[in-house]
């Protein structure tokens, strides 16, 4: 069985081409909550008998799966990219790309350099950006209520993790320091403009998080932060949703129960 936790306001993100097996269930945190609240709910559930956490960034298999984008790009290009661009919520994908790069160095056939990890967040929800710009390994204080408001005001809500694996050993901070990386902050307007430009040029729509990454690449080019002849990998983490949904019946998962953000273990157990 699979139990998913998600903020109630983001249930529209769970869409499918056909109904799922009833072994898949969803519970949600009430409207106004954010992904951290949903993650916290999931953590409480995993304290109950019979439930095990997927593991997030600490799940090696998950990181290795995410690393296939770097593996695919590098083997196709024939060399390690000079820059790796991605929008981040937890930063797990960027960590995975860095780890894949280190394996390529051991392999030796694709170059002896590290791709600079260039990541981005969606303003006003930019806690990792703020920490990086302050040259701080530790995340800066972020009021919970303000964080929830900020998280619900961005177009790329999947990027709104309040407790990402940024500070831990081997986390995003280390990946960026090791590669001379950089952090970008992108407004909703910049993301929407970049998404439209991508669709015009490439012929396919992209998801908001991918649009944030695209906007960060535009920023880097405009600010001369990448060379004109650089080999750049832009990780488009999702796209084609608009095209896929055309003339199709789409099914949405509905929560079996919605919990308050301060629900305790006994409430959830019931």
Give short role names for the model-derived ranges.
Residues 17, 35-50, 103-114, 118-205, ...:
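Active-site/ligand-binding loops adjacent to catalytic centers
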Residues 58-60, 88-92, 119-126, 159, ...:
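Glycine-rich beta-alpha junction loops
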Residues 86-89, 115, 176, 192-196, ...:
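Substrate-binding/catalytic subdomain of NAD(P)-dependent oxidoreductase enzymes
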Residues 1, 11-15, 63, 90-98, ...:
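Short glycine/serine/threonine-rich phosphate/pyrophosphate-binding segments
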Residues 2-80, 148-173:
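Small/polar-residue-rich loop-to-helix segments that shape phosphate-bearing ligand pockets
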Residues 214-270:
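Catalytic phosphate/nucleotide-handling subdomain of diverse soluble enzymes
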Residues 62-99, 106-108:
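Glycine-rich ThDP/TPP pyrophosphate-binding loop and its adjacent helix/strand module
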């Amino acid at each position: 069985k699979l139990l998913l936790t998600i903020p109630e306001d983001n249930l529209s993100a769970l869409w499918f081409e056909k109904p799922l097996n009833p072994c898949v269930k969803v519970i949600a945190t009430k409207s106004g909550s954010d992904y951290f609240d949903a993650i916290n709910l999931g953590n409480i559930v995993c304290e109950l008998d019979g439930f095990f956490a997927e593991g997030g960034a600490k799940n090696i298999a998950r990181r290795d799966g995410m690393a296939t984008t770097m593996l695919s790009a590098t083997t196709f290009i024939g060399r390690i990219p000079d820059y790796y661009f991605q929008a981040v919520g937890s930063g797990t994908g960027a960590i995975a790309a860095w780890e894949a790069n280190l394996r390529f160095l051991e392999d030796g056939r694709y170059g002896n350099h590290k791709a600079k990890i260039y990541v981005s967040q969606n303003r006003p929800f930019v806690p990792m950006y703020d920490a990086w710009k302050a040259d701080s390994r530790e995340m800066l204080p972020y009021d919970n209520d303000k964080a929830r408001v900020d998280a619900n005001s961005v177009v790329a809500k999947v990027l709104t993790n309040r407790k990402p694996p940024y500070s831990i050993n081997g986390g995003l901070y280390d990946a960026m320091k090791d590669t001379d990386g950089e952090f970008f902050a992108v407004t909703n307007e910049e993301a929407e403009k970049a998404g439209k430009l991508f669709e015009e040029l490439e012929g396919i729509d992209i998801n908001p998080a991918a649009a944030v990454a695209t906007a960060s690449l535009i920023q880097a080019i405009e600010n001369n932060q990448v060379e004109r002849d650089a080999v750049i990998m832009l990780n488009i983490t999702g796209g084609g949703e608009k095209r896929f949904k055309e003339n199709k019946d789409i099914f949405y998962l509905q929560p079996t129960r919605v919990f308050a953000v301060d629900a305790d273990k006994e409430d959830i157990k019931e």
